[in-house]
Amino acid sequence: MTIRHDSITAELALRLVVPGGAPVPVAATVRYEPADPYAISIGFRTGADEVVEWTFARQLLSDGVRRPAGDGDVQVWPAAQSGGRIVCLSLSSPSGHALFEMPRSEVLAFLRRTYSAVPLGGESDIIDLDAELALLIWGGPER
């Protein structure tokens, strides 16, 4: 199996859902690093030089395109609106909660690119879980 190692990024035009108001456009960059094959990151520009980044499972985003997924700080689910199909992304933290709408076609295009770099099920070919577990338990390689 051939695995690419370059970062995969995409710019997404999200909409922040504002209760009782019009949605607010938010620029975001979604990123996938094949060296960390189970995760994706999404960075929200909050100011000229500030980015708030969230990292969560690639599988969560993939599942959420088709059906509601997640039961913690990150939840993803499909929805429809007059402009077409979207993916909703709910993020919760002690400092607040945000609900974003993402164009489904853009999310699917990004996911396809990640799966061409590291196919579904190929994540364990990149990460040696035994070595990672040994590092957590003993602070070094297996003994």
UniProtKB/Swiss-Prot annotation:
* GO BP terms: asexual sporulation resulting in formation of a cellular spore; cell division; cell septum assembly; division septum assembly; hyphal growth; positive regulation of cell division; spore wall assembly
Where does it live in the cell? Cell septum
Similarity section: Belongs to the SsgA family.
Tell me if Cell division is a UniProt keyword of this record.
yes
Keywords attached to this Swiss-Prot or TrEMBL record, sorted alphabetically, are:
Cell cycle, Cell division, Septation, Sporulation
Q: Where is the major localization of this protein?
A: other
According to its UniProt entry, what is the function of this protein?
A: Involved in sporulation-specific cell division. Required for early stages of sporulation. Important in the process of growth cessation prior to sporulation-specific cell division. Recruits cell division protein FtsZ to the future septum sites and tethers the contractile ring structure (Z ring) to the cytoplasmic membrane during sporulation. Stimulates polymerization and filament length of FtsZ in vitro.
- In its UniProt entry, the species of origin is given as Frankia casuarinae (strain DSM 45818 / CECT 9043 / HFP020203 / CcI3)
What Pfam families does this protein map onto?
A: SsgA (PF04686)
A GO cellular component term found in this entry reads: spore wall
Outline the subunit composition: Interacts with SsgA. Interacts with FtsZ (via N-terminus).
Q: Protein name, please?
A: Sporulation-specific cell division protein SsgB
What domain of life does the UniProt record list for this protein's source? Bacteria
